[in-house]
Amino acid sequence: MAIGDSVFPTEVVKVDNKVIYPDLWKEFEREFEKLPDANANAFIYSLYHLLKKYTSFIPASTQDFPESSLFEHLKTTGAFAHCFAAYKEEFPNVFGNDNRIRNIKSSHFPVKLFCGDISGIQTFIYNITNKAAAKSLKGRSFYVQLLAESIAQEVLEASGCTLINQVYAAGGKFYLLLPNTTLVNNAITDYKYKLEKALWEEFNGQLSVNMDEINFSFILGGERSRILINGESDTTDVGTLWKKLSDKTSAQKRRRFADVFMDSYNSIKPLFEAGGTGGEIQVCAVSGIEIEKNKTKNIKKDDIEQGEEVELPVAAYVKKQIDLGRDLYTHKYLVELVNDSVKGYEAGV
């Protein structure tokens, strides 16, 4: 490409927001009327994306929060409102009586900051041969991204929450704001075990998800609200809360698959005894792992990037990722299908 005026910065055109806001509001109202209202979840998710479209680049407040978008402010406010409402259903007397503000009683911690972090990403992505390297790399990278987003979504749904409660999700890591209720705590405990078991059965320890949480409350008043973490006597700020949870989640790497191992220890067939089929077995041509009998998939010549082979045996999950890598070249959209008839929540890998 030749260097010309087109690659250098140009003069910024200033826009009068006072002129644009009324037009944005009219467009927002027009699209709001089209939102589906037959299903509550469909309405919430549609409203979420509509607000994201129209309010992401509007400041939450031109004086107090000019750097924060109105969309993030609305989303975070909605998440906290949901946490307080759900917690109050279980603990009706959580709030004190005040003429100006509603203080949270000292013995209550209604909000849970929850973190999930996928471990083993680099090893997992690059543990491949050159037989189908390009499609495998692309497919595996995208698969890890989908896995993190799917786990976050499953935790939200198991907890009776929505995308509004998701603070952040990127790079194989996510943070959620959840109500600290018995229902949510039981749902998370149950889901953690199901997920751990599913990941072990699918990847034999190559990928794991570290999860932890911190329950907290607020002390309102003064210039800023202060955060009180359950089990601590001193108040803190958001940055410290975030770091403490990050450190707790990282520490979970030392306890990977602990529940699976304990189940194995107490079961009839312990995990660390001799296993497998023995004899001549097939090995995945891409990852090099052993493949159990009747679980072999084949990739065709179109997906084989080096060598003269017409067909190669691979593990089932490797075949999925190669297919995913190929589909990324030819598809523009990702569509999520939700089955509302399913009761409870099973971890899907």
Named regions from a protein language model:
Residues 1-349:
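Regulatory and interdomain segments flanking nucleotide-handling catalytic cores
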